[in-house]
Amino acid sequence: MRENFKELPMGVRDYLPGEAALRRYLENLFVELVAKEGFQEVITPSFEYYETLRESSETDLIKFVDRTGELLALRGDMTTPIARVVSTKMKHRELPLKIFYAATVFSGNFSGRNKLREFKQLGIEVFGDITSKLESDLIKLMAVYLRKAKVKNLEISLGHVDILTGLIEEYELFNHFSEIKNALNQKDYVALEGIFERAGKSQRVRESLVDFLQQRGGKAILRKAKKMLSHPKAKKALEELEEVTEYLISEGVRELKLDFSLVRDLNYYTGLVFEAYTPYLGYPLGGGGRYDTLLKKFGWDTPAFGFALGLERIVESIANSIDK
Protein backbone atom coordinates (compact mmCIF):
# COMPACT_ATOMS: atom_id res chain seq x y z
CA MET A 1 0.00 0.00 0.00
CA ARG A 2 1.28 3.47 -0.87
CA GLU A 3 2.44 5.53 2.10
CA ASN A 4 0.40 8.53 0.92
CA PHE A 5 -2.92 6.67 0.60
CA LYS A 6 -4.54 9.21 2.94
CA GLU A 7 -3.62 12.07 0.63
CA LEU A 8 -5.11 13.24 -2.66
CA PRO A 9 -3.29 13.35 -6.00
CA MET A 10 -2.13 16.75 -7.21
CA GLY A 11 -4.82 18.82 -8.90
CA VAL A 12 -7.88 17.57 -6.98
CA ARG A 13 -9.33 18.54 -3.62
CA ASP A 14 -12.09 18.01 -1.06
CA TYR A 15 -14.76 20.59 -0.20
CA LEU A 16 -15.83 20.77 3.44
CA PRO A 17 -19.34 21.85 4.54
CA GLY A 18 -18.94 25.65 4.43
CA GLU A 19 -17.35 25.77 1.00
CA ALA A 20 -19.55 22.97 -0.30
CA ALA A 21 -22.62 24.99 0.70
CA LEU A 22 -21.31 28.08 -1.11
CA ARG A 23 -20.63 26.02 -4.24
CA ARG A 24 -24.14 24.58 -4.15
CA TYR A 25 -25.65 28.05 -3.67
CA LEU A 26 -23.70 29.52 -6.61
CA GLU A 27 -24.61 26.60 -8.86
CA ASN A 28 -28.30 26.83 -7.96
CA LEU A 29 -28.22 30.60 -8.51
CA PHE A 30 -26.88 30.02 -12.03
CA VAL A 31 -29.38 27.27 -12.85
CA GLU A 32 -32.36 29.35 -11.67
CA LEU A 33 -31.21 32.41 -13.62
CA VAL A 34 -30.64 30.71 -16.96
CA ALA A 35 -33.73 28.49 -16.66
CA LYS A 36 -35.85 31.65 -16.37
CA GLU A 37 -34.29 32.78 -19.67
CA GLY A 38 -35.50 29.63 -21.43
CA PHE A 39 -32.35 27.51 -21.26
CA GLN A 40 -32.71 23.73 -20.84
CA GLU A 41 -30.20 21.41 -19.22
CA VAL A 42 -28.24 18.73 -21.07
CA ILE A 43 -26.07 16.13 -19.28
CA THR A 44 -23.30 14.27 -21.11
CA PRO A 45 -20.87 11.48 -20.07
CA SER A 46 -17.66 12.39 -18.27
CA PHE A 47 -15.62 10.59 -20.94
CA GLU A 48 -16.00 10.03 -24.67
CA TYR A 49 -13.92 8.85 -27.61
CA TYR A 50 -10.67 10.79 -27.81
CA GLU A 51 -11.34 11.65 -31.45
CA THR A 52 -14.59 13.35 -30.44
CA LEU A 53 -12.95 15.61 -27.86
CA ARG A 54 -9.58 16.38 -29.43
CA GLU A 55 -10.96 19.40 -31.34
CA SER A 56 -11.12 21.53 -28.20
CA SER A 57 -7.83 21.14 -26.35
CA GLU A 58 -5.90 18.12 -27.56
CA THR A 59 -2.78 18.58 -25.44
CA ASP A 60 -4.68 19.00 -22.17
CA LEU A 61 -6.96 15.98 -22.39
CA ILE A 62 -6.57 13.12 -19.91
CA LYS A 63 -6.50 10.03 -22.15
CA PHE A 64 -6.83 6.33 -21.33
CA VAL A 65 -7.41 3.03 -23.11
CA ASP A 66 -10.31 0.82 -22.05
CA ARG A 67 -10.34 -3.00 -22.00
CA THR A 68 -11.51 -3.18 -25.61
CA GLY A 69 -8.53 -1.10 -26.78
CA GLU A 70 -10.55 2.05 -27.49
CA LEU A 71 -8.75 5.36 -26.88
CA LEU A 72 -10.98 7.48 -24.63
CA ALA A 73 -10.60 10.83 -22.89
CA LEU A 74 -12.16 12.72 -20.01
CA ARG A 75 -13.95 15.82 -21.27
CA GLY A 76 -11.77 18.93 -21.08
CA ASP A 77 -14.61 21.36 -21.63
CA MET A 78 -18.36 21.13 -22.24
CA THR A 79 -18.72 22.91 -25.57
CA THR A 80 -17.58 19.97 -27.69
CA PRO A 81 -19.80 17.36 -25.93
CA ILE A 82 -22.79 19.71 -26.14
CA ALA A 83 -22.06 20.33 -29.83
CA ARG A 84 -22.08 16.55 -30.38
CA VAL A 85 -25.41 16.11 -28.58
CA VAL A 86 -27.31 18.89 -30.34
CA SER A 87 -25.88 17.95 -33.77
CA THR A 88 -26.79 14.28 -33.52
CA LYS A 89 -29.95 14.33 -31.38
CA MET A 90 -31.52 17.81 -31.27
CA LYS A 91 -30.93 19.60 -34.58
CA HIS A 92 -34.53 19.13 -35.74
CA ARG A 93 -35.93 21.03 -32.77
CA GLU A 94 -37.08 24.63 -33.00
CA LEU A 95 -34.22 27.13 -33.27
CA PRO A 96 -32.50 28.74 -31.57
CA LEU A 97 -31.62 25.89 -29.21
CA LYS A 98 -30.77 27.22 -25.75
CA ILE A 99 -28.77 24.77 -23.60
CA PHE A 100 -27.20 25.03 -20.15
CA TYR A 101 -24.96 22.76 -18.10
CA ALA A 102 -23.35 22.53 -14.67
CA ALA A 103 -20.75 19.83 -15.09
CA THR A 104 -17.35 18.59 -13.96
CA VAL A 105 -14.52 18.75 -16.52
CA PHE A 106 -10.91 17.58 -16.40
CA SER A 107 -7.51 18.84 -17.50
CA GLY A 108 -4.16 17.13 -17.89
CA ASN A 109 -2.43 20.50 -17.60
CA PHE A 110 -2.69 21.89 -14.08
CA SER A 111 0.27 24.24 -14.15
CA GLY A 112 0.12 28.02 -14.29
CA ARG A 113 -3.39 29.37 -14.00
CA ASN A 114 -4.94 25.87 -14.23
CA LYS A 115 -4.41 24.71 -10.66
CA LEU A 116 -6.92 21.86 -10.76
CA ARG A 117 -7.26 18.71 -12.83
CA GLU A 118 -10.94 18.43 -11.90
CA PHE A 119 -13.23 21.45 -11.80
CA LYS A 120 -16.81 22.50 -12.43
CA GLN A 121 -18.08 24.62 -15.30
CA LEU A 122 -21.34 26.55 -15.38
CA GLY A 123 -22.24 27.42 -18.93
CA ILE A 124 -24.73 28.09 -21.68
CA GLU A 125 -24.70 27.46 -25.44
CA VAL A 126 -27.08 28.75 -28.13
CA PHE A 127 -27.37 27.13 -31.56
CA GLY A 128 -29.09 28.43 -34.68
CA ASP A 129 -30.11 32.03 -35.24
CA ILE A 130 -27.15 33.93 -33.73
CA THR A 131 -27.56 37.70 -34.04
CA SER A 132 -25.42 40.50 -32.67
CA LYS A 133 -28.20 41.29 -30.19
CA LEU A 134 -28.31 37.69 -28.99
CA GLU A 135 -24.53 37.67 -28.49
CA SER A 136 -24.83 40.87 -26.48
CA ASP A 137 -27.70 39.51 -24.40
CA LEU A 138 -25.69 36.42 -23.46
CA ILE A 139 -22.73 38.54 -22.36
CA LYS A 140 -25.18 40.62 -20.32
CA LEU A 141 -26.59 37.41 -18.78
CA MET A 142 -23.08 36.41 -17.69
CA ALA A 143 -22.56 39.85 -16.13
CA VAL A 144 -25.91 39.66 -14.31
CA TYR A 145 -25.03 36.26 -12.84
CA LEU A 146 -21.59 37.36 -11.65
CA ARG A 147 -23.11 40.44 -10.01
CA LYS A 148 -25.70 38.26 -8.25
CA ALA A 149 -22.85 35.98 -7.14
CA LYS A 150 -21.26 39.05 -5.45
CA VAL A 151 -18.11 39.03 -7.59
CA LYS A 152 -16.48 42.38 -6.87
CA ASN A 153 -14.92 44.77 -9.40
CA LEU A 154 -16.01 42.71 -12.39
CA GLU A 155 -14.40 43.45 -15.76
CA ILE A 156 -15.41 41.94 -19.10
CA SER A 157 -12.84 41.93 -21.90
CA LEU A 158 -14.18 41.85 -25.46
CA GLY A 159 -12.25 40.86 -28.56
CA HIS A 160 -12.73 39.30 -31.98
CA VAL A 161 -10.83 36.46 -33.64
CA ASP A 162 -10.88 38.18 -37.03
CA ILE A 163 -8.93 41.17 -35.74
CA LEU A 164 -5.90 38.90 -35.39
CA THR A 165 -6.77 36.94 -38.55
CA GLY A 166 -7.05 40.14 -40.57
CA LEU A 167 -3.84 41.53 -39.10
CA ILE A 168 -1.94 38.33 -39.94
CA GLU A 169 -3.23 38.34 -43.52
CA GLU A 170 -2.62 42.07 -44.00
CA TYR A 171 0.97 41.87 -42.73
CA GLU A 172 1.70 38.44 -44.29
CA LEU A 173 2.42 36.62 -41.04
CA PHE A 174 0.74 33.34 -42.04
CA ASN A 175 3.68 31.12 -41.06
CA HIS A 176 3.77 32.54 -37.55
CA PHE A 177 0.09 32.28 -36.59
CA SER A 178 0.52 29.65 -33.83
CA GLU A 179 3.52 31.46 -32.34
CA ILE A 180 1.66 34.77 -32.31
CA LYS A 181 -1.42 33.22 -30.74
CA ASN A 182 0.64 31.54 -28.00
CA ALA A 183 2.48 34.79 -27.23
CA LEU A 184 -0.82 36.67 -26.99
CA ASN A 185 -2.31 34.03 -24.68
CA GLN A 186 0.72 34.50 -22.41
CA LYS A 187 0.61 38.32 -22.83
CA ASP A 188 4.29 38.02 -23.74
CA TYR A 189 4.85 41.11 -25.86
CA VAL A 190 8.65 40.74 -25.84
CA ALA A 191 8.26 37.33 -27.49
CA LEU A 192 5.71 38.85 -29.85
CA GLU A 193 8.16 41.48 -31.08
CA GLY A 194 10.75 38.74 -31.58
CA ILE A 195 8.31 36.84 -33.79
CA PHE A 196 7.71 39.93 -35.91
CA GLU A 197 11.47 40.45 -36.20
CA ARG A 198 11.99 36.86 -37.41
CA ALA A 199 9.22 37.49 -39.93
CA GLY A 200 11.35 40.26 -41.41
CA LYS A 201 9.28 43.23 -40.29
CA SER A 202 10.96 46.61 -39.82
CA GLN A 203 11.38 48.10 -36.36
CA ARG A 204 8.67 50.67 -37.10
CA VAL A 205 6.19 47.98 -38.13
CA ARG A 206 7.15 45.74 -35.19
CA GLU A 207 6.60 48.52 -32.67
CA SER A 208 3.34 49.53 -34.32
CA LEU A 209 1.97 45.97 -34.24
CA VAL A 210 2.97 45.34 -30.62
CA ASP A 211 1.53 48.68 -29.55
CA PHE A 212 -1.74 47.89 -31.33
CA LEU A 213 -2.06 44.44 -29.77
CA GLN A 214 -1.48 45.87 -26.29
CA GLN A 215 -4.44 48.23 -26.62
CA ARG A 216 -7.12 47.79 -23.96
CA GLY A 217 -9.83 50.31 -23.20
CA GLY A 218 -13.14 51.79 -24.24
CA LYS A 219 -14.63 52.77 -27.57
CA ALA A 220 -11.84 55.30 -28.20
CA ILE A 221 -9.38 52.56 -29.16
CA LEU A 222 -11.72 51.46 -31.96
CA ARG A 223 -10.99 54.69 -33.81
CA LYS A 224 -7.26 53.98 -33.67
CA ALA A 225 -7.81 50.43 -34.86
CA LYS A 226 -9.89 51.54 -37.85
CA LYS A 227 -7.02 53.76 -38.98
CA MET A 228 -4.44 50.98 -38.68
CA LEU A 229 -6.28 47.98 -40.14
CA SER A 230 -7.58 47.94 -43.71
CA HIS A 231 -8.19 44.21 -44.16
CA PRO A 232 -11.93 43.51 -44.75
CA LYS A 233 -12.06 40.79 -42.05
CA ALA A 234 -10.56 43.08 -39.42
CA LYS A 235 -12.76 46.04 -40.40
CA LYS A 236 -15.91 43.90 -40.17
CA ALA A 237 -14.76 42.56 -36.79
CA LEU A 238 -14.26 46.11 -35.49
CA GLU A 239 -17.77 47.04 -36.65
CA GLU A 240 -19.21 44.02 -34.81
CA LEU A 241 -17.29 44.93 -31.65
CA GLU A 242 -18.56 48.49 -31.82
CA GLU A 243 -22.16 47.35 -32.25
CA VAL A 244 -21.98 44.93 -29.31
CA THR A 245 -20.23 47.48 -27.08
CA GLU A 246 -22.81 50.19 -27.77
CA TYR A 247 -25.69 47.81 -27.08
CA LEU A 248 -24.21 46.49 -23.83
CA ILE A 249 -23.55 50.00 -22.54
CA SER A 250 -27.14 50.96 -23.37
CA GLU A 251 -28.27 47.91 -21.34
CA GLY A 252 -26.26 48.97 -18.29
CA VAL A 253 -23.27 46.66 -18.76
CA ARG A 254 -20.44 49.09 -18.12
CA GLU A 255 -17.74 46.66 -16.94
CA LEU A 256 -16.38 46.45 -20.51
CA LYS A 257 -12.84 46.66 -21.86
CA LEU A 258 -11.96 46.13 -25.52
CA ASP A 259 -8.88 43.92 -25.91
CA PHE A 260 -7.39 43.41 -29.38
CA SER A 261 -5.06 40.66 -28.11
CA LEU A 262 -7.86 38.47 -26.76
CA VAL A 263 -7.89 35.19 -28.70
CA ARG A 264 -8.72 32.60 -25.99
CA ASP A 265 -6.91 29.27 -25.82
CA LEU A 266 -9.42 26.95 -27.46
CA ASN A 267 -9.25 26.18 -31.17
CA TYR A 268 -12.85 26.52 -32.31
CA TYR A 269 -13.70 30.23 -31.90
CA THR A 270 -14.52 32.09 -35.12
CA GLY A 271 -15.86 35.51 -34.10
CA LEU A 272 -16.56 37.58 -31.00
CA VAL A 273 -14.73 36.37 -27.87
CA PHE A 274 -14.87 37.57 -24.27
CA GLU A 275 -13.54 36.85 -20.78
CA ALA A 276 -14.62 37.88 -17.27
CA TYR A 277 -12.05 39.12 -14.75
CA THR A 278 -11.78 40.45 -11.24
CA PRO A 279 -8.67 41.93 -9.57
CA TYR A 280 -9.17 39.35 -6.81
CA LEU A 281 -8.12 36.54 -9.15
CA GLY A 282 -5.02 36.30 -11.32
CA TYR A 283 -6.76 34.57 -14.24
CA PRO A 284 -10.20 34.71 -15.93
CA LEU A 285 -13.37 33.64 -14.16
CA GLY A 286 -14.42 32.26 -17.52
CA GLY A 287 -15.39 33.35 -20.97
CA GLY A 288 -16.70 32.32 -24.33
CA GLY A 289 -17.56 33.44 -27.81
CA ARG A 290 -18.82 32.50 -31.22
CA TYR A 291 -17.96 29.23 -32.97
CA ASP A 292 -19.46 28.61 -36.41
CA THR A 293 -17.49 25.58 -37.61
CA LEU A 294 -17.35 23.14 -34.68
CA LEU A 295 -20.75 21.58 -35.39
CA LYS A 296 -19.80 20.75 -38.99
CA LYS A 297 -17.63 17.98 -37.55
CA PHE A 298 -20.83 16.33 -36.27
CA GLY A 299 -22.83 16.86 -39.47
CA TRP A 300 -24.72 20.06 -38.67
CA ASP A 301 -23.62 23.34 -40.24
CA THR A 302 -25.03 25.98 -37.90
CA PRO A 303 -23.62 28.93 -35.93
CA ALA A 304 -23.27 28.81 -32.15
CA PHE A 305 -22.38 31.06 -29.24
CA GLY A 306 -21.80 30.41 -25.56
CA PHE A 307 -19.76 30.84 -22.41
CA ALA A 308 -18.47 28.85 -19.44
CA LEU A 309 -17.54 30.01 -15.95
CA GLY A 310 -15.29 28.17 -13.51
CA LEU A 311 -17.16 27.57 -10.26
CA GLU A 312 -13.94 27.13 -8.28
CA ARG A 313 -12.63 30.40 -9.67
CA ILE A 314 -15.77 32.26 -8.63
CA VAL A 315 -15.51 30.83 -5.11
CA GLU A 316 -11.80 31.73 -4.92
CA SER A 317 -12.42 35.31 -6.08
CA ILE A 318 -15.17 35.80 -3.49
CA ALA A 319 -12.93 34.44 -0.72
CA ASN A 320 -10.05 36.68 -1.81
CA SER A 321 -12.26 39.77 -1.88
CA ILE A 322 -13.50 39.06 1.67
CA ASP A 323 -9.94 38.57 2.93
CA LYS A 324 -8.96 41.99 1.57
Curated annotation (Swiss-Prot):
It holds the Pfam family tRNA-synt_His. Pathway: Amino-acid biosynthesis; L-histidine biosynthesis; L-histidine from 5-phospho-alpha-D-ribose 1-diphosphate: step 1/9. It comes from the Bacteria. GO terms for biological process: histidyl-tRNA aminoacylation; L-histidine biosynthetic process. PROSITE patterns: AA_TRNA_LIGASE_II. Required for the first step of histidine biosynthesis. May allow the feedback regulation of ATP phosphoribosyltransferase activity by histidine. HAMAP family: HisZ. This is ATP phosphoribosyltransferase regulatory subunit. The gene is hisZ.
